Amino acid sequence: MARRDALTGKSALSGQSRSHALNATKRKWNLNLQKVRVMDENGSVFNIKVSARTLRTLKKQEKIV
């Protein structure tokens, strides 16, 4: 399973680290993924991985079990 937010589809960003001499090395900025139990409109519960930002939104909407 990819490191991707199950609800928003966000994934890691790629770029370069730059040293003081401006040497470039590839790197990734991974998401802060959390496992969460979520309830949908029908009342069924399932486990998904969401980012910390999405987790805040779910808590606000009271969708977390």
UniProtKB/Swiss-Prot annotation:
GO biological process: translation
Example GO molecular function: structural constituent of ribosome
Region Disordered, annotated ranges: 1-26
Bias (Polar residues) ranges: 11-22
Keyword Transcription regulation applies: no
SUPFAM superfamilies documented for this protein: L28p-like
GO cellular component, one term: ribosome
Keyword match Ribonucleoprotein: yes
Keywords: Ribonucleoprotein, Ribosomal protein
Family annotation (NCBIfam families): L28
Family: Belongs to the bacterial ribosomal protein bL28 family.
Name of protein: Large ribosomal subunit protein bL28
Organism: Mycoplasma capricolum subsp. capricolum (strain California kid / ATCC 27343 / NCTC 10154)
Source species taxonomy: Bacteria, Bacillati, Mycoplasmatota, Mollicutes, Mycoplasmataceae
Gene (UniProt): rpmB
